[in-house]
């Protein structure tokens, strides 16, 4: 895949992930699959905060899709913060048997998001 194709698919991925983060995280945490997307003990304030942060990131990823190469730092931040967040949660879920469902829920979702963006982001900035 050449860089032009990567950027086109990257724009599509940013739109899809942006919409998912904006409208999908809160319902997954609260109604659709809390076992795989929420953590115990349930803390409403924390859940609202994390859903708000991801909804905001979703808006900015969606906007970045217009011209992904102008938003490399946002995309790189999304990649690395998702890897770090996913790794921490994976370690916690591995240690805490009550959180094992997260190993097939939010943890792989973060790693998948990071992987897709990493694969599609051209390695060097266009000049």
Show the residue positions of the predicted features:
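Core segments of alpha-helical transmembrane spans in multipass integral membrane proteins
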Residues: 19-27, 44-66, 77-87
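Cytosolic juxtamembrane helix and N-cap/initiation of the first transmembrane helix
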Residues: 1-19
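Membrane-helix boundary connector in multi-pass membrane proteins
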Residues: 87-105, 122-123
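Individual transmembrane alpha-helices with interfacial aromatic-anchor signatures
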Residues: 50, 99-113
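A loop-to-helix transmembrane entry motif
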Residues: 13-14, 38-54, 102
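Membrane-water interface at the C-terminal end of transmembrane alpha helices
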Residues: 111-127
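Membrane-interface helix termini and inter-helical loops of multi-pass transporters
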Residues: 31-42, 93, 97-98
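Membrane-helix interface segments
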Residues: 69-73, 99-100
């Amino acid at each position: 895949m050449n860089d032009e194709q990567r950027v086109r698919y990257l724009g599509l991925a940013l739109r899809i992930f942006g919409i998912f983060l904006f409208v999908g995280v809160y319902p997954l945490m609260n109604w659709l699959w809390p076992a795989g997307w929420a953590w115990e003990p349930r803390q409403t304030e924390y859940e609202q905060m994390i859903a708000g942060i991801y909804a905001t990131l979703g808006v900015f990823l969606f906007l970045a899709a217009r011209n992904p190469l102008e938003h490399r730092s946002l995309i790189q931040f999304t990649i690395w913060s998702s890897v770090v967040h996913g790794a921490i949660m994976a370690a916690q879920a591995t240690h805490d048997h009550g959180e094992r469902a997260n190993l097939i829920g939010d943890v792989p979702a973060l790693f998948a998001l990071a992987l897709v963006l990493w694969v599609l982001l051209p390695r060097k900035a266009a000049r």
